[in-house]
Amino acid sequence: MKEVILDAQARTVGSKGDLAFLRKSGKIPAIFYGKGIKPEAIAVSSKVFVSIMEANGANVIINLNFKDGKKAAIVKSLDRDFLTQHTIHIDFHAISLEDKIEVLVPVHIAGVADGVKNFGGVMEFIVREVKVEAIPRNIPQKISVDVKALRIGQGITVADLPELDGVKYVQDSSTLIVHVIAVAAVFEEEKPEAMAGGTATVVQPEVIISKGKKDKEDEEAEKGTSVASPTTATGGTKK
């Protein structure tokens, strides 16, 4: 994972009007939490955060720059506005750079399969991400797989993925990632998603589309609950 710095400022849990004003001023309300850490309400620059996501994707170590120093975190989940798709809330989960964590890493397909190029087959993606375990700095931004040799009826499983230093695949080794099928099979099985390139499974981070429900801070303030930590390789409970 790459490392970036993002300034974070403390904020109070206010009303929906306060949150709307915060967003109009170019800030995104967020929560910083983790195992043994009291959740902190913070705000970050919308412009800087969006540029970080566009340049690095979700798998990036974000060193939140507080007044009392930097704290390492990853993006656990995002809330997006239903109409504009703008990010309106972020969950930052605290991490230790020395402890292993489990995250989803996107799989990148390199080349055009022989069965597609020369025999009219269709590439069908079963999963687009795989779960790995590693210390944060060893987690790759993506995992590349060469599919040029694949013929119709052949595929790639987790067991076929390249070995990476310090990285362990924690999904079942027999999990099928991508395969090449005949066009006839696509119509017989009624899988229009195969023609469109397949569908993704769980994404990292989780994206929540807001349809006008109460903001997360309002719900937390009313319920008086704390934000739980997700499971890592060193223990904890998943959010």
From Swiss-Prot:
One of the GO BP terms on file: translation
The keyword rRNA-binding belongs to this UniProt entry's keyword annotation: yes
Source species, domain of life: Bacteria
GO terms for cellular component: cytosolic large ribosomal subunit
Composition bias type Polar residues, residue spans: 226-239
Keyword annotations: Ribonucleoprotein, Ribosomal protein, RNA-binding, rRNA-binding
Region (Disordered): 211-239
GO MF annotation terms: 5S rRNA binding; structural constituent of ribosome
Listed PANTHER family: RIBOSOMAL PROTEIN L25/GLN-TRNA SYNTHETASE, ANTI-CODON-BINDING DOMAIN-CONTAINING PROTEIN, RIBOSOMAL PROTEIN L25_GLN-TRNA SYNTHETASE, ANTI-CODON-BINDING DOMAIN-CONTAINING PROTEIN
Family of the protein in this entry: Belongs to the bacterial ribosomal protein bL25 family. CTC subfamily.
NCBIfam families registered for this protein in UniProt: bL25_bact_ctc
Quaternary structure, from the entry: Part of the 50S ribosomal subunit; part of the 5S rRNA/L5/L18/L25 subcomplex. Contacts the 5S rRNA. Binds to the 5S rRNA independently of L5 and L18.
Function statement: This is one of the proteins that binds to the 5S RNA in the ribosome where it forms part of the central protuberance.
Matching HAMAP family: Ribosomal_bL25_CTC (MF_01334)
Name of the protein: Large ribosomal subunit protein bL25
Protein's organism: Endomicrobium trichonymphae
